[in-house]
Amino acid sequence: MTKNNEAGWNLDHSYTTLPQSFYTEIPPTPVSSPELVKLNHSLAISLGFNPEELKKEAEIAIFAGNALPEGAHPLAQAYAGHQFGHFNMLGDGRALLIGEQMTPSGKRFDIQLKGSGPTPYSRRGDGRAALGPMLREYIISEAMYALDIPTTRSLAVVTTGEPTYRETKLPGAILTRVASSHIRVGTFQYAAARGSIEDLQSLADYTIKRHYPEIEAHENRYTALLQEVIKKQASLIAKWQLVGFIHGVMNTDNITISGETIDYGPCAFMDNYDQGTVFSSIDTQGRYAYGNQPYMAAWDLARLAESLIPILHEDEEEALKIAQDEISKFSVQYEKQWFLGMKKKLGLFSNEEQDQSLIEQLLKMMEKFKADYTNTFRSLTLNTIENTALFESPEFKEWYKLWQSRLEKQEESKENAYEMMKNNNPSIIPRNHRVEEALEAAVTNGDYSVMEKLLEALSNPYAYATEQEEYCVPPAPTNRPYRTFCGT
């Protein structure tokens, strides 16, 4: 069933120009009684949709997979991935790309239904999703967007009227995810593992045309592609680290070629500053701990470089050298982006020899005194040094004098320095206990008002508004560490 186009659907299907080994065409599995519980109005408008039309029954049927919009071409994408270091052939096991929405400004975005039923890549899974994890992805991805961190976004969440079974019986839901594309490091691993250089080349050419058209004429465009992805990921991971975001499952199938954050399963934001912070219940070894994220990104990008070796140079030794040389640049690019970001968080404009040690000393003290990461920078920004173990310590008081002296040294006024800090230190993040509170109200009680209020606060993280203050309070100390789950 297809419907007419009053809502603003304008779908294209460039992904189907790739060899058919990269996808399987399959319709979504219908559900019994879909209900729209969340629609992203501003995103809908930017994509060229009419939000009021999207609330109608016929459109809700599309978000549920019970109907298809005009021009839809549903398919599940194939890819591979190193999951916690182990290589597997994977694919969309519970998601379908229904098409690429062409926006009024000529941009192209994937529209994907997540939780739309089983596919040939489901590996014994039911292809469904639970309401809690889908709402969680909506909240965190919108918070990331507001924090100016490249991310996939959520257009809608519908409940299915059917239960899904995980450890317990849970209400089912489908999320409509929007992404610049769903091409991953794992997509290239999939192509390389199949052994067809022609297919690998087709994927690389398609990716360049879609994401990096400026390098199409490059003498060695595949090396240039690797360089661009490294640059994007170095910037992305630096942004994660600067706000205390912990992804939790940085497998190669969750590293996008576009440089967007994807898959909000076991992610969370750090409260107390600790390099070893892990939230994911399945990350028992701390592989994807906060402090490891830059190293794991480099590891994942090395897998991309390996996959590209057959097309980097006709001589394998030369291709290997190119790959190694490019990967070695990641840490330099990441450090540069992170250092620049940390300087902004401390209001430092110019470059001084002492800047590195100022930053390192502060972080060391924060870890020692288990200081709240976000609130420490928030207090420095507001210049309200509260009564905490960190701020009361002699070493902090010494550091504070050095920092103030450093601010006075630069040409820019302190007023400008504090303004820059305000623009780079969010006063509010999606605190784990607040997110859980919103999910509990929505999933258990059918009360979405807690989530709406939280989303409103998170939509302007640099506002420093008084009405946001209740969301700045860290969780109460507890003996039980916060744990996240992947939702699959």
Curated annotation (Swiss-Prot):
This is Protein nucleotidyltransferase YdiU. The keyword Nucleotide-binding applies. Mg(2+) binds at residues 254, 263. InterPro entries: SelO. ATP binds at residues 91, 93-94, 114, 126-127, 177, 184, 263. Residues 108-127 are annotated as: Disordered. Belongs to the SELO family. Transmembrane segments: none annotated. The keyword Magnesium applies. It catalyses: L-seryl-[protein] + ATP = 3-O-(5'-adenylyl)-L-seryl-[protein] + diphosphate; L-threonyl-[protein] + ATP = 3-O-(5'-adenylyl)-L-threonyl-[protein] + diphosphate; L-tyrosyl-[protein] + ATP = O-(5'-adenylyl)-L-tyrosyl-[protein] + diphosphate; L-histidyl-[protein] + UTP = N(tele)-(5'-uridylyl)-L-histidyl-[protein] + diphosphate. Its EC number is 2.7.7.-, 2.7.7.108. Pfam families: SelO. Keywords: ATP-binding, Magnesium, Manganese, Metal-binding, Nucleotide-binding, Nucleotidyltransferase, Transferase. The active site is at residue 253. It is an enzyme of class 2 (transferase). It comes from Bacillus cereus (strain AH820). Nucleotidyltransferase involved in the post-translational modification of proteins. It can catalyze the addition of adenosine monophosphate (AMP) or uridine monophosphate (UMP) to a protein, resulting in modifications known as AMPylation and UMPylation. It comes from the Bacteria. Its cofactor is Mg(2+); Mn(2+). GO terms for molecular function: AMPylase activity; ATP binding; magnesium ion binding.
